[in-house]
Amino acid sequence: MAPTAASAAAGEEQQAVGLAARDSSGHLSPFAISRRSTGDDDVAIKILFCGICHSDLHCIKNEWKHSIYPLVPGHEIAGVVTEVGKNVTRFKAGDRVGVGCMVNSCRSCESCNNGFENHCPEGVFTYNSVDKDGTVTYGGYSSMVVVHERFVVMFPEAMPLDVGAPLLCAGITVYTPMKYHGLNAPGKHVGVLGLGGLGHVAVKFARAFGLKVTVISSSPGKKREALERLGADAFVVSSSAEEMEAARSTMDGVINTVSANTPMAPYLALLKPNGKMILVGLPENPLEVPPFSLVHGNRTLAGSNIGGMADTQEMIELAAKHGVTADIEVIGADDVNTAMERLAKADVRYRFVIDVGNTLHAAAAE
């Protein structure tokens, strides 16, 4: 079925405004969106905040070669429920909620039945994806969205929407590998490779789990930030042979958040025997992994991609309990193109969040 932009759902469509890229220039400008009517199992959400993920930048510029234009990005959505379908029991109008990287799946395969909707072969992403009815999904750089209730997360009262929105991508991306690879047991020693949008959240979750945390970075200037502000226990400059040697075979696991191509052997050497390195960054080119680096010490190299819906709800509740939030810079909708330029230069600490509720309609009217 060819992708279409208009909703195929029965009933009256709901009009929204968004910011869309029309081509690989990536320039975002106002765009009228027709959302489907609120179905029996759906939740309609007024979007108040939406985080900017680095993948948004890749997609608007078609750097991954699968962009469908016009493209409305955004999969770190936080807002308020305005309407629910007749079968919805978990949510009601006025609830504070979020939507992350997925808005649908088959809901019946082994992965879905085991709570791993993120591994469903028929999974539908929040934007730049084709839903079951053939429509193209539009993301959270928009005034409202309609989502099946299974893919909506309830925000705890203690979690502010603006600093919580990025956790729906960055948070679950680092939380899941810690949980499923045994790196959430107090006293374990975890390394966080890279201190950016993912890395700074990984440090915070590691501290919430009671772990010893070492930040590994190529930027010596981030040492004070890591130790004094984020609370890491140690900092290793990856270009220092002396510091890397001192940290050799000391870590139970490493969460690798780096998207640049880096040699794996020096970082695998930081692991204890039976240690695990989990990749959550996506380098453009294949990685060089000398087999001896894994075989010697029985080390494991694994990957992890976001998380299922139950884990996402669990993550946001644990984050609220322990005060884990993203460090953000709130911007208006009219500043989004400048923010994208800055993001391309890594000029943000650590996540941009669009104040959709207060600024999108004004930006669209200009």
Swiss-Prot record:
Its EC number is 1.1.1.195. Pathway: Aromatic compound metabolism; phenylpropanoid biosynthesis. GO terms for biological process: lignin biosynthetic process. Zn(2+) 2 binds at residues 106, 109, 112, 120. It comes from the Eukaryota. It holds the Pfam family ADH_N. Binds 2 Zn(2+) ions per subunit. Its cofactor is Zn(2+). NADP(+) binds at residues 55, 173, 194-199, 217-222, 257, 281, 304-306. Gene3D superfamilies: Medium-chain alcohol dehydrogenases, catalytic domain, NAD(P)-binding Rossmann-like Domain. Keywords: Lignin biosynthesis, Metal-binding, NADP, Oxidoreductase, Zinc. GO terms for molecular function: cinnamyl-alcohol dehydrogenase activity; coniferyl-alcohol dehydrogenase activity; zinc ion binding. Zn(2+) 1 binds at residues 53, 75-76, 169. It catalyses: (E)-cinnamyl alcohol + NADP(+) = (E)-cinnamaldehyde + NADPH + H(+); (E)-coniferol + NADP(+) = (E)-coniferaldehyde + NADPH + H(+); (E)-sinapyl alcohol + NADP(+) = (E)-sinapaldehyde + NADPH + H(+); (E)-4-coumaroyl alcohol + NADP(+) = (E)-4-coumaraldehyde + NADPH + H(+). Homodimer. Involved in lignin biosynthesis. Catalyzes the final step specific for the production of lignin monomers. Catalyzes the NADPH-dependent reduction of coniferaldehyde, 5-hydroxyconiferaldehyde, sinapaldehyde, 4-coumaraldehyde and caffeyl aldehyde to their respective alcohols. Belongs to the zinc-containing alcohol dehydrogenase family. This is Probable cinnamyl alcohol dehydrogenase 3. It comes from Oryza sativa subsp. japonica.
